[in-house]
From Swiss-Prot:
PANTHER family: GLUTAMATE-1-SEMIALDEHYDE 2,1-AMINOMUTASE, GLUTAMATE-1-SEMIALDEHYDE 2,1-AMINOMUTASE 1, CHLOROPLASTIC-RELATED. Pathway: Porphyrin-containing compound metabolism; protoporphyrin-IX biosynthesis; 5-aminolevulinate from L-glutamyl-tRNA(Glu): step 2/2. The keyword Isomerase applies. It catalyses: (S)-4-amino-5-oxopentanoate = 5-aminolevulinate. Homodimer. This is Glutamate-1-semialdehyde 2,1-aminomutase. Its EC number is 5.4.3.8. It comes from Campylobacter jejuni subsp. jejuni serotype O:2 (strain ATCC 700819 / NCTC 11168). Keywords: Cytoplasm, Isomerase, Porphyrin biosynthesis, Pyridoxal phosphate. It comes from the Bacteria. GO terms for molecular function: glutamate-1-semialdehyde 2,1-aminomutase activity; pyridoxal phosphate binding; transaminase activity. Belongs to the class-III pyridoxal-phosphate-dependent aminotransferase family. HemL subfamily. Gene3D superfamilies: Aspartate Aminotransferase, domain 1 (3.90.1150.10), Type I PLP-dependent aspartate aminotransferase-like (Major domain) (3.40.640.10). Its cofactor is pyridoxal 5'-phosphate. The gene is hemL.
Length: 424
């Protein structure tokens, strides 16, 4: 069966033909590739085509596809049982592994998705502060829970809808929206609202394209939260163990009250988490009155994959230097080639994350990102795919480098960029 036939068939049974909207390739006027398997830095579709994969399952695969150590850990766990609905020692081991490197985090709770992690973190913040409102930033995506689908990035940006049908006004009214990297917009909202329970932010935004928050902005944001008895939540579902081993904390050294994790923490399996100091975490049920639960939370296969992934990342001291150098080579190479062709392009990287925008002006917030030439991006994406390079099918997503990539792969990619720029 071909990709085209597979998508047509799938659309008969799965809404939209996909289980997450961006996978449909709708915003690049194309149809998705159905993947048969992956190996290292490559994926292979059912038509027999191979691609250098810069999506890496949207970030979780720090060590690429089919990493032997992670596979071995999963197989060992599977032989003992796939799920118990009861505590296992694997949960404790992964909890210790995560918390050991964050001096301000004392306890953690595992869930199955980033959406669950951010949703639970906000409920926890409201329960702890006894306040109602939350403040988020325009273009930051924190999953698809109702209160966070307001001025969201990622899928919402891709499909030109700042919110979603089905989100009640009574829910949305409790969500305040500030401008990313603009501290004055934050101050204005705090002046008008005295009941803000938490501020949630991607300290390294990856869902309006890659847009890092400025150091002075984050420092001032932390001060405002502290002065107003408002909890600061860093959503590191994407940037955790990607920007550095310690995520944004390893770069900005700001101690958020709550951190959410995901993607890499599960080693490619469904897992996420939220963590904080004990006095906050201890109001979670069964100790306190904030309820959170999940049938597959702390699933042993996901815990085993997470332990293997993080242990390997921690041992390889030069891993992040290597990934960062490759990401830098890629983005600088893209910028140079674009300049040579007179194409408007902004490109940057943070650790193993990279992003690019088809716009002539620097991008520091959501409105800047929206100025990108989407038609140009669509043409570029199509040409890169034809040249064997699998990039995220949205201008408003982030790309990822994995450990199985090397200079040769980056050189191959840049040659594809050169050819694609010639055609567009």
């Amino acid at each position: 069966m071909t990709n085209k036939k597979a998508f047509k068939e799938t659309c008969k049974f799965i809404a939209g033909g996909v289980n997450s909207p961006v996978r449909a390739f709708a915003n690049v006027q194309s149809e998705p590739k159905f993947i048969s398997h992956g190996k290292g830095a490559y994926i292979f579709d059912i038509d027999g085509n191979s691609y250098i994969d810069y999506v890496q399952s949207w970030g979780p695969l720090l060590f690429g596809h089919c990493d032997k150590d992670i596979q071995k850990a999963c197989q060992k766990a599977l032989h003992k049982g796939s799920s118990f609905g009861a505590p296992t020692l694997l949960e404790t081991e992964l909890a210790k592994l995560v918390l050991s490197d964050f001096p301000h985090l004392e306890k953690i709770r595992f869930v199955s998705s980033g959406t669950e992690a951010t949703m639970s973190a906000i409920r926890l913040a409201r329960g702890f502060t006894k306040k109602d409102k939350i403040l988020k930033f325009e273009g930051c995506y924190h999953g698809h829970s109702d209160s966070l689908l307001v001025s969201a990035g990622s899928g919402a940006a891709t499909f030109n809808s700042p919110s979603s049908l089905g989100v009640l006004e009574d829910v949305a009214k409790h969500t305040l929206v500030a401008k990313y990297n603009d501290i004055n917009s934050v101050k204005e909202l705090f002046e008008k609202n005295k009941d803000i329970a938490c501020v949630i932010i991607e300290p390294i935004a990856g869902n309006m394209g890659l847009v890092p928050a400025k150091q002075d902005f984050l420092e001032e944001l932390a001060k405002i939260c502290k002065n107003n008895q408002t909890l600061l939540i860093f959503d590191e579902v994407m940037s955790g163990y990607r920007a550095s081993y310690l995520g944004s904390y390893g770069i900005n050294h700001i101690q958020a009250d709550i951190i959410t994790f995901g993607k890499v923490i599960g080693g490619g399996l469904p897992a996420a988490a939220f963590a904080s100091r004990a006095e906050i975490m201890d109001i979670l049920s069964p100790l306190g009155g904030v309820y959170q639960a999940g049938t597959l939370s702390g699933n042993p296969l996901a815990m085993a994959a997470g332990i293997a992934s993080l242990t390997k990342a921690k041992k390889k001291t030069k891993l992040y230097d290597k990934l960062g150098k490759l990401a830098k080579k890629l983005t600088q190479g893209m910028k140079k080639l674009a300049d040579e062709k007179g194409l408007p392009l902004q490109a940057c990287h943070v650790g193993s994350m990279f992003g690019y925008f088809f716009t002539k002006d620097p991008v520091s917030n959501y409105q800047d990102a929206l100025k990108s030439d989407l038609a140009l991006f669509s043409k570029f994406h199509k040409n890169m795919l034809e040249n064997g390079i699998y990039l995220a099918p949205s201008q408003f997503e982030t790309g990822f480098i994995c450990s199985k990539m090397d200079d040769k792969i980056i050189d191959t990619t840049l040659e594809a960029v050169r050819e694609s720029f010639k055609r567009i």
